[in-house]
């Protein structure tokens, strides 16, 4: 995480989007995730959405994690939007919870429908819509509803990670 924090500091982003799976349900160590979050929020405003790993830990562990994020000043978006403004530009930043928080469905059609139900009322055609949603495999759903930019997680290694050709595509994940 120190390298990531250093890269973020150098990049000077306007915002930092955390798109879930910041904790690992198989090896839950909140301190690692919270240390990263604590450093990230010093760099830029941070917006966080849940991933499937957050849904898979106990409710007590997740509640403790989220409470800590909020105390640090991180905006946790649960199927809601915030308006970002700069000069004349308005951006709707929309955060959708991972569908595993709603239903332990494994069929893509069911999860896609859950996401559409949560996302549709939040999109605003007067603004540029940036959607934070954990699941890249539902990109077609997001685009069909009117999302102009979608930032996702879930791929654990990223769909982008180029230097010496890492990442780019994760099978069955968008």
Q: What residues fall within each predicted segment?
A:
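Short acidic, glycine-rich surface-loop motifs adjacent to enzyme active sites
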Residues: 15, 19, 23, 126-138
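Conserved beta-sheet core of the metallophosphoesterase superfamily
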Residues: 130, 135-174
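Active-site metal-binding loops of divalent metal-dependent hydrolases
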Residues: 20-22, 52-54, 80-81, 96-99, ...
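Short, flexible loop segments at the rims of nucleotide/cofactor-binding pockets, characterized by
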Residues: 23-27, 55, 105-109, 128-129, ...
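Membrane-embedded segments
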Residues: 1-77
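Binuclear metal-dependent hydrolase catalytic cores centered on His/Asp/Glu-rich metal-binding motifs
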Residues: 63, 67-74, 86-129, 139-140
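Short, Asp-centered acidic motifs that coordinate Mg2+ and/or phosphate
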Residues: 14-15, 47, 74-75, 91, ...
